[in-house]
């Protein structure tokens, strides 16, 4: 086969593998338990959407990436972004260790020598997150993180509409080294100028400041949305 034919078949194979991974994840017993636990969580009144990324609920393939280029994907939702030329990073899916963890899996990011100026993990939200979304909605994020040592961590919601992207930034506070920190932050879409009729993409960035020689474990991450209360 010629090079062009090989490239086309490779693209088809990658798309097929992604579809098969999603199918296997949906049928995974742990993923089923994770979805049931998410449905049972008490969330604000009027919650009309809740979601946990697949890499928290079921096993993905491959399980990890070492020395990733910026923009490298892990699973079909997560990506790592950085400007570190040495790429001394490892991002991998791990099993959560505690029986009380709602998600059976998490992500672990190990950082060795880091000379870059930024490092983040991005999570793409599904298309369902945009159905009926308005500026009267609040998007709620709950995370559980374990940091090897203290560092500043930020959550940034990005809303792409037409040629524009609106950003909402929240700092995750009270992060201590060696301890699991449960965090809840809310993004009020009233503070954006998003065009509700031109929504194209929504994604979340977890941004790590000065991450050199450290590790971060993400043991929980889920999002939900509800309407702002009327006064």
What do these predicted ranges mean?
Residues 81-105:
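Extracellular glycan-recognition surfaces and repeat-rich motifs
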Residues 112-132, 162-164:
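Secreted extracellular polysaccharide-interacting domains
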Residues 162-199:
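Extracellular carbohydrate recognition and processing domains
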Residues 144-153, 161-162, 210-213:
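Extended, low-complexity, turn-rich repeat/linker tracts enriched in Gly/Pro/Ser/Thr and Asp/Glu
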Residues 1-86, 227-231:
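Activation corresponds to long, low-complexity, non-globular regions
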């Amino acid at each position: 086969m010629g090079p062009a034919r090989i490239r086309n078949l490779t693209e088809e194979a990658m798309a097929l593998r992604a579809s098969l991974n999603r199918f296997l994840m949906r049928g995974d017993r742990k993923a089923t338990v994770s979805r049931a636990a998410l449905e049972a969580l008490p969330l604000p009144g009027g919650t009309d959407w809740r979601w946990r990324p697949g890499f928290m609920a079921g096993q993905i393939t491959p399980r990890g990436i070492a020395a990733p280029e910026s923009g490298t994907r892990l699973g079909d939702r997560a990506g790592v972004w950085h400007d570190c030329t040495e790429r001394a990073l490892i991002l991998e899916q791990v099993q959560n260790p505690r029986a009380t963890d709602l998600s059976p899996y998490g992500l672990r990011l190990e950082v060795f020598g880091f000379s870059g100026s930024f490092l983040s993990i991005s999570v793409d939200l599904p298309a369902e997150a945009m159905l009926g979304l308005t500026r009267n909605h609040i998007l709620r994020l709950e995370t559980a993180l374990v940091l090897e040592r203290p560092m500043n961590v930020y959550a940034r919601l990005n809303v792409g509409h037409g040629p524009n992207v609106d950003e909402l930034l929240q700092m995750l506070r009270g992060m201590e080294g060696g301890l699991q920190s449960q965090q809840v932050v809310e993004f009020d879409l009233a503070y954006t100028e998003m065009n509700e009729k031109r929504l194209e993409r929504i994604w979340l960035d977890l941004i790590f400041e000065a991450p050199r020689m450290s590790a971060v474990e993400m043991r929980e991450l889920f999002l939900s949305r509800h309407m702002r209360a009327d006064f």
